[in-house]
Amino acid sequence: MPIFDLRVVCLGTTAAYLATLLNGSMFTHSEPGKIRWHGLVPAKAMHAAKSRLGRDELVAAFLIDTVTALLESSRVACVSVITADRNLEALAKSLGAQAVREPTPSGLLHALQLGMHTVPPSMGTIIALGDLPCLTPTDVNAFLESADLHDSSFISDSEGTGSTMWARRPASTALPHFGVRSRATHRENGSIEIPGSPRAHRDVDTPTALWDAIRIGVGPATMRALEETTPTLATISGLDPIKAVDETGHQRTYPDYTLIEILAPKIGQRVQIDPGTKHITLAQ
């Protein structure tokens, strides 16, 4: 029986072989008798990621919810985040994941190749993009139950042209493809498409996709980030510094916010407060 738990620490290849010699099996929290999976999550530097969304807080929140879904899956032994961003590296470690440092940003496929070299050959590989805020451990488990049966497999994105997750069994030489037409490329290369829940299909790289993710249901980190960055309507209740009461009756002070096209703010004036830009504008 395994005596170690990989839920907390993801051990490298050498340690994995040592465990095999000591215990007769890889030590992991995965279910007995099934493939043990190593999760990989590529993460762009925050200043380069999701420019169409324009909020670093959301990018980090997406990553947190994605990594957490993998870490809490009963089928995933450990998770590594591949990134050149030191802040995201620290974030990954704070979640209990391992960080694989990308020396310089060289593109998604290069980052994945770097990460795949760290996966012990006796383990399967599951790759999830870092922008899956709706993903849950149940979704991951369901995908891997099917991935157990195929050399390589994948889940397409909501638009039906790309991919959100991909997996290959131990000893497989299959390679992943993400981005435009990756669904077709995966199928052409023999990967099996696995049907998933709307949560597993929904990646987020545009405001429209974010709206759809909110409709489906996002994870707790993304929900908190949205609450902290979504513009709200309020009524000015104090001046110098600006105070305002939101629609729930809570009053807050905004000393470092900039008034936009409001030359002489007045108590009782209706405004929109945007935490993302720290702007206060007249309510429309």
Regions found by a protein language model. Give the residues of each.
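N-terminal nucleotide-binding beta1-loop-alpha1 segment
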Residues: R7-T14, M26-L53, T235
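Short phosphate-binding loop-to-helix
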Residues: L91-I126, S182-T185
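Structural detector for short beta-strands of small beta-barrel domains
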Residues: P231-G238
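Beta-strand/loop nucleic-acid-binding surfaces
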Residues: H250-A264
